[in-house]
UniProtKB/Swiss-Prot annotation:
The keyword Acetylation does not apply. Residues 174-276, 289-388 form the PpiC domain. This is Chaperone SurA. Residues 453-463 have a biased composition (Pro residues). Its EC number is 5.2.1.8. It is found in: Periplasm. InterPro entries: OMP_Chaperone_SurA, PPIase_dom_sf, PPIase_PpiC, PPIase_SurA, SurA_N, Trigger_fact/SurA_dom_sf. Chaperone involved in the correct folding and assembly of outer membrane proteins. Recognizes specific patterns of aromatic residues and the orientation of their side chains, which are found more frequently in integral outer membrane proteins. May act in both early periplasmic and late outer membrane-associated steps of protein maturation.
Length: 463
């Protein structure tokens, strides 16, 4: 069964359901209301309503897992505020998305959903979303992604020592963990009263879960202050090197289905659930790569040498080599590849696709010692001699690269979440909707904004 188009795009639109206030106001009758002021920007009520609808569409048939409408609206509004702040910070640092880049991204979204851009327009219209609003939301998502990339490049590094330690740890445990969490956030420099309120709230949430009155995912949606609350607090699969050291030992001793905590971390109190675990090495296969050693001679085409002249020259050089001339000596004398000419055309060891598919196809088709027929690439006319082949085990190299990536991802997540907290804490935010209307703030809401001691909603399913 085909999913509704709004569901297919929900993950994009929940996070970045932002539009140009002017454009949206011009399209809305009556004039759109302001849901929140965010520094010099605004979140419109139409943006908030649309994002809430998208969350509800993701929970179709599971409505009892969602919090009351006022709590859901507050959670979604906080997420939209964070998007506005990130976009503002990115644009202030010079991050831009051109119309051409935006058009390519939208064409890709259309293709992924099995339609054309025109078809995308029609489906958006059927779901009640203007195309201009959709373009703005996609632009904002790209901007936020680039801000994260810039943040990672400037602040995140992984040393070889960290990779070595993680590899040793993985060899000992060999496990991966599917985790979920609930965060009861605390502001930086929290007072004793704020800490006590947060402790009371997290204890109440844990009690609901332990009694079976609320499952973990529903509790996360309802009570967590984490950015992934609306995904049930799901953290996905993690290896130990992706888990903060303070929690790694605890998780190693847990059983699937078990909930640990409350745990005090830098962001507040956390409940941690081990959903399931698996052997990271199960099904792992040794990866062997075929590499080639080859020499080549290049004759370029340019202002001083026509296509026909270049082809005639390469034909002559090949004839000399086939007639007994030494390939390396001929390359040193006649090749126009300045990088390899001094080495007799030697390219060293390389995988088949290292110099493009046309070059690789020629090398793969030769036997060791054989010389190819002349062939054309963008660089010009070539002949290549295959010297040898070897099988290289790249499993260890790939494993190190994967470990480096996972450590970097974990560091980025931790640091970027702290960065978002700082960004939110420094911002001027004034809510104009719901029970927080006219509440001006320069920091994120304290945990007491949600019930301090949660009580179960009626008719909640038990585990």
């Amino acid at each position: 069964m085909t999913k509704p188009f709004s569901v297919l795009l929900a993950s994009l639109l929940v996070i970045t359901s932002t539009v140009s206030p002017l454009a949206s106001a011009q399209q809305s009758q009556p004039l759109d209301r302001i849901a929140a002021i965010v520094d010099e920007d605004v979140v419109l009520q139409s943006e908030l309503d649309r994002a809430v609808r998208n969350v509800k569409s993701q929970y179709a048939g599971r409505d009892n897992q969602l919090p009351p409408d006022d709590v859901l609206q507050r959670q979604v509004l906080e997420r939209l505020v964070l998007v506005k702040l990130q976009v503002g910070r990115a644009e202030g640092s010079g991050i831009r998305v051109s119309d051409e880049e935006l058009n390519r991204a939208i064409a890709s979204i259309a293709q992924q959903n099995g339609t054309s851009v025109d078809g995308l327009r029609q489906k958006l219209a059927a779901d009640g979303m203007g195309y201009a609003d959709f373009r703005a939301s996609v632009r904002d998502e790209i901007i936020v992604q680039r801000l994260r990339q810039s943040f990672a490049q400037s602040r995140i590094s992984v040393s070889e020592g960290e990779v070595d330690t993680a590899l040793a740890q993985q060899a000992t445990t060999g496990s991966q963990y599917h985790l979920a969490h609930i965060l009861v956030g605390l502001p930086e420099g929290a007072t004793a009263e704020q800490i006590a309120t947060g402790q009371k709230k997290v204890d109440g949430v844990k009690a609901l879960i332990d009694k079976g009155e609320l499952d973990f995912s529903a509790a996360a949606v309802r009570y967590s202050d984490s950015p992934n609350a609306l995904e049930g607090g799901d953290l996905g699969w993690r290896s130990l090197d992706e888990i903060p050291n303070a929690f790694a030992q605890l998780i190693r001793d847990m059983q699937p289905g078990q909930v640990a905590g409350p745990l005090r971390g830098p962001s507040g109190f956390q409940l941690l659930k081990l959903v399931e675990m698996r052997d990271a090495n199960a099904g792992g296969e040794k990866k062997v790569l075929t590499e080639y050693n080859a020499r080549h001679i290049l004759v370029r085409i340019g202002d001083n040498q026509t296509e026909a002249q270049a082809k005639a020259k390469i034909d002559t050089l090949r004839a000399r080599i086939v007639g007994g001339a030494d390939f390396q000596a001929t390359a040193k004398e006649s090749s126009e590849d300045t990088n390899s000419r001094g080495q007799g055309g030697d390219l060293g060891w390389f995988p088949a696709d290292a110099f493009g598919p046309d070059f690789g196809k020629q090398v793969e088709g030769l036997t060791d010692g054989a010389v190819s027929e002349p062939f054309r690439t963008q660089a010009g006319w070539h002949i290549v001699q295959r010297v040898g082949t070897r099988q290289t085990d790249v499993s260890a190299e790939n494993q190190r690269a994967q470990i480096r990536e996972t450590i970097g991802r974990r560091k980025l997540e931790e640091e970027y979440n702290r960065y978002l907290q700082e960004l939110r804490g420094e911002a001027f935010v004034s809510f104009r909707t719901g029970d927080r209307a006219d509440a001006d703030a320069t920091a994120a809401p304290e945990p007491a904004a949600a019930p301090a001691a949660p009580t179960p909603p009626p008719a909640q399913p038990t585990r």
